[in-house]
Amino acid sequence: MKKIGTVYLVGAGPGAEDLITLRALSLLKSADVVIYDNLSSAFLLFECRKDCEKIFAGKIAGHKCNSQDEINALLCQKAKDGKMVVRLKGGDPFVFGRGGEEAAALEREGVPYCVVPGVTSAISAAESEGIPVTHRNLARSFRVITAHGASCLSEAYFSQFAKNEEETLVFLMGVSSLENISKGLIAGGMKSNTPCSIVESGTTIKSRRIDATLETLVLRAKEKCVSSPAVVVVGKTAALNFKSSAFSLSGKKIGITGTSQIVEKQRKAFFETGAQILSGAFMKIDINEKAMQDVFSCGFSCVDWIFFTSSSAVNLFFDAFETSEYDLRSLFDVKFAVVGGETAKTLRKRGFKADFVPENANSESLSKEFVQKFGKSAKNVIALRADGGSKEMNAVFEAENIPFKDFCIYRTKADIDLLSLFAKSSEVLDFVAFSSSSAVRAFFDYCRETKIEGLKESAKAVCIGKATFETCAKEIGEKRCVLAKNCTAESMVDAVLQNSF
């Protein structure tokens, strides 16, 4: 008899991809099937296994959608097929998420299930824009109310909480019901000058706050073209704004592009500055098997120096080395030159210390400073790097008549689905960080092909490497491009700081 699988009713959090819980993320990475609703952060779905079956069960206005009974039946069926099922819901599954109905259906069918709490937007969306739902001497409690179907609610319904001035009211799914909320609360006895705030797309890169009073709530929403998803906060705490401006990049919105490793390093560096970050890890590494075979076919007995221009090149080379006919003794007489400190750290983890690191961490300095230090005494140099890199290194070695071979052992290509998610949010960015020409081309080509607006005219691009800068300048002009001094996350942050004001 086939073993019944388990269904996990999982909260995805309010929208920001890094506000999902560790337990939820672990389950998402292990699931056989993910049945998901409309998510503010669709990036989460890319955490799933490649063979995971992903089924959309959300509701889109004007489109036919699954009924709750159909969703319940689907959950039960997938579990009875022996699958590990994650039912992924925005926010928390038991806060207006029909998680209770699904749990009851699973209970009736004898299907094992587990509830994994999520961060609810009822608190976090307001909080992300500086609004506490409770505050001493202002609000002793808060009430979370679904505004879905508010047009059917009577004045008597609103009157039960309209007169409590020490309570914060939080309405979810309330954009289409703002007029009913406003009129109902005022009719129930709430003062028309009561502070209100609408938080649109809270915790995400598109988050914005629109302040009003109960009387002006509808007008302000129309003026600002408010759209879902949004949380409506009513009460004294809606007048507060606990959002620090002490950080160096407070209020700035930064998009970071590249491979997942590059994006994560830069994200950490920018996070410390108080910037809002849109992660764009849409570039994937594709190893060039032929070039890698050529490296090993040549052998290492006649190689004096190996140049690495990225951590990716280091890892790809040593991964291939482990499965080759060679062992580490083959490299006993080889020296290593790397582009910068981060690449040197990666090399150290592989058991080798870099013999040369340029003062300025970029490909041009790597070759020029190397020649200045070693001159023509350097011989038999090979470079292992990405396809499409700067040809400056080739020119430097040719000019000095130093034997040099260039192996493009990998290329980077865009994951269209991830690129699409990034591009659709890019119009709000103040800066976008590019670490390669391929990322620049992928982004701007996609925006042109899909007619997505892309970067606003005031946005600037911060680039690592001269080749990346030149590629970007062709797209948006040199005045809007900034060249980072070195190819490090810290250098990217410095470049943004110097061009922010």
Which functions belong to the PLM regions below?
Residues 152-197:
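Conserved anion/nucleotide-ligand pocket segment
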Residues 37-50, 116-135, 335-345:
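Short, compositionally biased "basic patch" segments
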Residues 1-17, 22-119, 305-313, 332:
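Class I S-adenosyl-L-methionine
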Residues 7-8, 85, 142, 169, ...:
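Conserved hydrophobic helix-helix packing surfaces used for dimerization/oligomerization
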Residues 14-15, 52, 61, 67-80, ...:
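Signature of uroporphyrinogen-III synthase
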Residues 107-110, 133-135, 187-193, 324-331, ...:
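A short alpha->loop->secondary-structure connector
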Residues 90-165, 210, 356-361:
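Class I SAM-dependent methyltransferase SAM-binding "motif I" and its flanking Rossmann-like core
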